[in-house]
Amino acid sequence: FSDGVSQSGMGSSNMPFGWDEGVGIYIAETLSQHPGISAKELARKIVLRAERNDNYRLLDDTSCCVIYRRTPRNLLICTGPPYDEKKDRYLAEKVRDFKGKKVLCGGTTATIISRELQLPLQVSMDITDKELPPLSYMEGIDLITEGILTLSKVERLLTQGIPEKSQGPANDLVNLIQNSDKITFIVGTRINVAHQDPNLPVELEIRRNVVKKIKYLLETKFLKDVEITYL
């Protein structure tokens, strides 16, 4: 971190010589309280605390970079039904056996997993984003969203950034992605007849092209390890 962090608070009654060694103490305490904190969030907390030390008027360049050496966080995102219905069971087993966070994007995808694994699927009525259908819930699955609309918005948020105080299924998925190291997509290639209307906006491309855009952004902008499997 820059000296804007270590020298923050300099001249104040409780930090006459700046934050100095207190930075290390703060980091140790934060890691003790939040052992799973991401590098991004820890860096953000350090900079925000430095800003607070300077009464929210930073007096110098204040930068912080955190490198977190740990076992990679894995995320599985499944979207779309397999081309061959005989592969439904294979998809469900892939989801069941995956070691990491699990996301299902699409009602058909969620229905397949629910049926094959005999797990109840519950649909929420809470609308948190007027552009998108609400979330669904299933035991063992971390996030269940609508499919192509949600993925299209995820691509937009990754490109433009997340507006302050915004929320919704796409935001939830972006947060999971940003806190993961390796993202594995399983993309079903069966065509969804609901998206064959030629009057739909251009942004609603077939799901595999949207996923390709997301993969490119994650690899080039966010330095994530991304793998796509088509089914």
What is each model feature region?
Residues 16-20, 120-122:
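Glycine-rich, phosphate-binding/catalytic loops in enzymes
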Residues 8-15, 32-37, 74-85:
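Membrane-interacting alpha-helical segments
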Residues 21-48:
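Helix-loop-helix
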Residues 39-67:
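Catalytic core of PPM/PP2C metal-dependent serine/threonine phosphatase domains
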Residues 1-16, 67, 105-109, 187-188:
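Conserved beta-strand-loop-short alpha-helix elements that form
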Residues 58, 103-105:
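Short conserved micro-motifs on helix faces and helix-strand junctions that flank
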Residues 71-101, 110, 114-231:
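Non-transmembrane, aqueous-exposed alpha-helical and coiled segments at domain scale
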